[in-house]
Amino acid sequence: MPKYRSATTTHGRNMAGARALWRATGMTDADFGKPIIAVVNSFTQFVPGHVHLRDLGKLVAEQIEAAGGVAKEFNTIAVDDGIAMGHGGMLYSLPSRELIADSVEYMVNAHCADAMVCISNCDKITPGMLMASLRLNIPVIFVSGGPMEAGKTKLSDQIIKLDLVDAMIQGADPKVSDSQSDQVERSACPTCGSCSGMFTANSMNCLTEALGLSQPGNGSLLATHADRKQLFLNAGKRIVELTKRYYEQDDESALPRNIASKAAFENAMTLDIAMGGSTNTVLHLLAAAQEAEIDFTMSDIDKLSRKVPQLCKVAPSTQKYHMEDVHRAGGVIGILGELDRAGLLNRDVKNVLGLTLPQTLEQYDIIVTQDDAVKNMFRAGPAGIRTTQAFSQDCRWDTLDDDRSNGCIRSLEHAYSKDGGLAVLYGNFAENGCIVKTAGVDDSILKFTGPAKVYESQDDAVEAILGGKVVAGDVVVIRYEGPKGGPGMQEMLYPTSFLKSMGLGKACALITDGRFSGGTSGLSIGHVSPEAASGGSIGLIEDGDLIAIDIPNRGIQLQVSDAELAARREAQEARGNKAWTPKNRERQVSFALRAYASLATSADKGAVRDKSKLGG
């Protein structure tokens, strides 16, 4: 039977110094036999998705201590991708994922904590904490800060829903007046919480439900709603139960690697495809699987993408629905219920509540549950009041959205598309694959061929788009923006948003070895692997080369002969130490980013660090 990790620092005469320090934090003799549980918070005033988390760690800690544990809180960093977008700050976003994972490992192992409650929310924070949890493999529960309410404003005598992306598009559209742009900006992000669409943050918080590491409702229940408080209270109580199950009963089913099994990873990816989640989730699930030592690859994702339909369509793929609407329709469990009825899920999985998938669906799927309290929870809705306070309102929808024919969540028979919301494409410059969010691609451009316009930085591409140098029919190629080449694999939300601003959203394609924001839609193909900086053939594309994209057949092809590509590769290699680096790009790269780049792998590996370079 395993002993508490914390006993290393709390037991034995030789640990008198450690106990003296523990006493200085408020611990007493009675605490030294209890499990020490880390409350891993991520409060910051920089990020609306985290601005309301300051007091929530204390809320969880109180429940831990009431249940017989000792709670110790610490904080991680948190980068706001939206604020970091469009300038050098975006170089730091993806690398922050590794820093978060490492910082959690450092704190938990340095102090021998027995278990964790992870209070996450936004883009790299949930993935970083997830990676750490699976690396450490001690009992854990995730509880996120929750989604923002959708923005709403009146334009042309009609109330419309808004989010961050609308503010970006209208701000760059020369046809939009200053007053309208200002109105949209002021209305787009009305409350605390992660941005209101199915962007990266909300996608990842939904996936923790499918992985079994968070409670039902975690991905969709609004940050502002009073009902969300119960998730935090439950997490504090439940983590003590899980911890004692493992350490006192030798029950390894309480460990995250046994909950988030390969079957659970497949379910999570199935959910992601069905709900049209962010392409970034592919990157993060691949990275998390490696930490869990699970053989889950792009090949697995490709197989799933060919059989899973799209059952949910949410902003940015449509402005009709946001996360508040997904919640009203039953949230993640509602989508999983439809996938289960379609025979597309692994049923032999459990969650942190100890429930199997069938048990979870029986209790929490609004289509089948008899539990009025559950139905009431899914009626939790927005208040439409600007606030940065968690749990500040208790508004409810009059009815649930249980219409599986025409509602937010659809049944298999009434799917938005028989093809899912994400697809993996392969071709002669994406030998290891690339990713497209098909949920955001107009049917008219699922097949697209056009001449390449090549840029070696996001900045140059933005200048060209706004300067009118990109025209209908072009394929914009942005390279040397991968994990190593950027470094940091910048998100390309500004280029895709500006294409829409210029009226080219359905008339152009964009291909990159970088990545896209969860707010991106359009024919936007990212994660091209291998990346240019690693010798990938995307580095051989020249202006005017024809590129053919065939999403239905999962293909992407540079229409240049093998002989010509071989000649170009030879010329590239002849550049010596300048080979596979961008030409005429001036970019200040800090030592910290260079250190990240030296170990970074391409996107098909999750952009994790190359362990082989460290003898791992």
Curated annotation (Swiss-Prot):
Domain of life per record: Bacteria
Swiss-Prot/TrEMBL GO biological process terms: isoleucine biosynthetic process; L-valine biosynthetic process
Active-site residues from the entry: S517
One of the record's GO molecular function terms: dihydroxy-acid dehydratase activity
Substrates-to-products reaction catalysed: (2R)-2,3-dihydroxy-3-methylbutanoate = 3-methyl-2-oxobutanoate + H2O; (2R,3R)-2,3-dihydroxy-3-methylpentanoate = (S)-3-methyl-2-oxopentanoate + H2O
Enzyme Commission identifier(s): 4.2.1.9
Positions of post-translational N6-carboxylysine modification: K124
Pathway entry: Amino-acid biosynthesis; L-isoleucine biosynthesis; L-isoleucine from 2-oxobutanoate: step 3/4; Amino-acid biosynthesis; L-valine biosynthesis; L-valine from pyruvate: step 3/4
UniProt KW keywords: 2Fe-2S, Amino-acid biosynthesis, Branched-chain amino acid biosynthesis, Iron, Iron-sulfur, Lyase, Magnesium, Metal-binding
Stored Pfam families: ILV_EDD_C, ILVD_EDD_N
Chain positions recorded as [2Fe-2S] cluster binding sites: C122, C195
One CC-aspect GO term: cytosol
UniProt enzyme class: lyase
SUPFAM superfamilies according to UniProt: IlvD/EDD N-terminal domain-like (SSF143975), LeuD/IlvD-like (SSF52016)
Residues given in the record as Mg(2+) binding sites: D81, D123, K124, E491
Gene3D superfamilies: IlvD/EDD C-terminal domain-like (3.50.30.80)
Segments crossing the lipid bilayer: none
Reported cofactor(s): [2Fe-2S] cluster; Mg(2+)
UniProt cofactor note: Binds 1 [2Fe-2S] cluster per subunit. This cluster acts as a Lewis acid cofactor.
InterPro entries, alphabetized: Dihydro-acid_dehy_C, DihydroxyA_deHydtase, DiOHA_6PGluconate_deHydtase_CS, ILV_EDD_C, ILV_EDD_N, IlvD/EDD_N
Function statement: Functions in the biosynthesis of branched-chain amino acids. Catalyzes the dehydration of (2R,3R)-2,3-dihydroxy-3-methylpentanoate (2,3-dihydroxy-3-methylvalerate) into 2-oxo-3-methylpentanoate (2-oxo-3-methylvalerate) and of (2R)-2,3-dihydroxy-3-methylbutanoate (2,3-dihydroxyisovalerate) into 2-oxo-3-methylbutanoate (2-oxoisovalerate), the penultimate precursor to L-isoleucine and L-valine, respectively.
Protein family per UniProt: Belongs to the IlvD/Edd family.
Subunit structure, as described in the record: Homodimer.
Name of this chain's protein: Dihydroxy-acid dehydratase
